[in-house]
Amino acid sequence: IEKLDYIKALGFTAVWITPIVENASGYDYHGYHAHDFSKVDRRYESEDVKFQDLIDAAHAKDMKIILDIVLNHTGNFGEANLCKLFNRNWDADQSSIDECMIPITQKDGGKLPDNYLSLPGGQQHDARLTHMKNTQGKNNDTHNYWHHVANEWNWDDYSRWYGQIAGDCVDLNTENPAVSNYLVKCYGEFIKMGVDGFRIDTGGHISRLTFNKAFIPQFEALAEQYKAKRNGGDFFMYAEVCARERNVVYRNHENCSPFYYTWK
């Protein structure tokens, strides 16, 4: 908030910020490995200043807030409302996974093995993933909240909708209405707060049909309903598409594919 005047003086009219939903810890500081879509990560707020204050301060200066959101995947520590595997200890060192992420083990009514913390890192990862992707041959993800395909996919065909792009990005089954409705509910809260647009991460890894049916209409309806929170302004959405074919972006016209519009 203190830097908004400086940013505006540079000529910028909007601030695009990385995802703010709660992540795990350690390397998951950047926002792209959600642990709880329904909460703002405490590391971005203080007791006196909340995300709403940033939105209001930007609007007061006639600036916009573009929020980066992730619909395609979670992190690999489960998700608090889809597959709860850990409790979060905010009083511990947030750079230490073992200290701040408290496993909910079987003896405590959870899903992780009782010896979880003594397992090597790779086995810990497998113990988490089996409850999200059924990687050990058991049907643990009975609600089908995640795609169960591993890493066999191609950048430029439909397989990227179902494959997992990395070990720390567990692919959500966005075709499942329970998943898409949950994501719309969570991110819809930010529309209600007055954010001016969404930059949608890994958009190319979700089918266009799912976007057109499960996400875009619901976001647009909320944006229209809460238009006054943006001082009557439009709501802008754009998505990341990472591919090897330039025509994925704009009909094979290379000069239209970069996103540094004002530099051309």
What are these regions (language model features)?
Residues 1-64, 72-74, 79-80, 114, ...:
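N-terminal structural segment of carbohydrate-active enzymes
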Residues 1-6, 174-193:
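Short, acidic/polar
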Residues 16, 66, 236-238:
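A structural signal for isolated positions on well-ordered beta-strands in alpha/beta enzyme cores
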Residues 26-38, 72-156, 217, 252-262:
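Aromatic- and acidic-residue-enriched segments that line the glycan-binding/catalytic groove
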Residues 47, 51, 176-183, 211-212:
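Aromatic/hydrophobic pocket-lining residues that form the small-molecule binding cavity
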Residues 55, 59-62, 73, 84-86, ...:
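Active-site-proximal helices and loops of the catalytic beta/alpha 8
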Residues 170-176, 199-204:
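Active-site rim elements
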